[in-house]
Amino acid sequence: MTFVETVAVPDNEERPSAGHNRPVADSTKCPNAREMKVQNRVAQRTHHRRLKTKLEVLRERLKEPEKQVGEPARVQTSTSTLVSDAATSLADSMCLVPAVQNDQAMAFDFLMTPSPSVGNDCPSNDLETMRQAASVHSNTLGGAFPLNRSPCTENMTPESQVSLSTAPLCFTSVVPAELDMDAFCTLDSSDWSRPNEESLLRLANYSTSVSPTNVQWGVDENAPLQDRVRYMRDQAVAMGFGSLDDVVEAHYTQKLECTSPSFQEQRLSRNRRLSRLLSTLHNAAKDWSEWERRGLQEQVTQGAEDILVSELNSYITQRSMNSTDDKIITGGLLDEQSRLRQDVEERRRLQDSLPNLGALLTTLLSRSNAPNQDARRDTVLAMIKTMCFDQDENMSIS
């Protein structure tokens, strides 16, 4: 503000000293100078009073937060009820809806999708990660929102009100309701950034022993194999499967929709990966105990029997419909050259119609020190003819 300064000059109008260079206002030449001076002083005093009033108001406003900071934080006896809603919603998001449990294709797609992350600052099995998550102090939130309280706490009783700015955001958002958080709660808000080692171990033990329907923290790809297998087993159970074996069984046997992403994956697995899987199981079973591999060997043997019997029955049915085969079986009147030609055709037909049975008999003869390759082929042909002879006799009698 600019102030107009006037200097009263005596009646004799003495000249100012030579060293005084400031101009002097003459009241005779400026008749309103005194009035302007009075008005300026009044305006200045009014402005000072307004500033003083504003300062007093600001001081009163600052006194109330200072009192709240000085008072100890009142914490509820157990904070599990405050975090139950958030934990339940997150746990529900990990569980399957009935539609997914009843739909194998949808369950496969959901199982192969990475589980939703709850944030890098949330507690995990690593104690160091939990320490970093727990180090979120109230000052971090207080800088932007000083001493703000949630509107939902206005109607709560004083015993159940908890200052949201003094609690770590991670613990109040995703901690399961079943986990007792009393060990993390202290009367001093500064202790939030330094939870004791026992509390961290309790949280770590809970996260490793949690049931599949509860919160899943996820497993890193560099984790030990047993941890990754256990995580996939828990995910399979959460998808509605009984075990990982049920997942593999459904993957190879269930009829999936053509539009499902798992459909092409299933076809590729049946054609290429299944044979490699069976070979790996067969080789690995050699190191298992007799009790462990008994079931696998029985199923493999039974499956081989079904395949060989089915091939033989199909071949017999095909032979019975071909009249020329009767001459080969009964040794009809054919010259030596015609008989040799018939034998070659018969071997070729055997290779096409009985690939597995022929391979099995050839392998057995090769390990029994048979004389030569031609003799093994003749022996295989004779064995197959013998197996078909009784069937042909029964058909001719009937």
UniProtKB/Swiss-Prot annotation:
Region entry Leucine-zipper, spans: 51-58
Residue intervals of the bZIP domain: 31-62
Region (Basic motif): 34-50
Disruption phenotype annotation: Decreases the expression of the entire KK-1 biosynthesis cluster genes and almost eliminates KK-1 production.
Region span, Disordered: 1-28
Location of this chain's protein in the cell: Nucleus
Domain of life from the UniProt record: Eukaryota
The protein's annotated pathway: Secondary metabolite biosynthesis
Source organism per UniProt: Curvularia clavata
Family to which this protein belongs: Belongs to the bZIP family.
GO cellular component: nucleus
Major location category of this protein: nucleus
UniProt keywords, alphabetically: DNA-binding, Nucleus, Transcription, Transcription regulation
Function, in words: Transcription factor; part of the gene cluster that mediates the biosynthesis of KK-1, a novel cyclic depsipeptide with 10 residues which is a promising active compound with high activity against many plant pathogens, especially Botrytis cinerea. Positively regulates the expression of all the genes from the KK-1 biosynthesis gene cluster.
Molecular function as annotated in GO: DNA binding
Protein name, UniProt field: Transcription factor kk1f
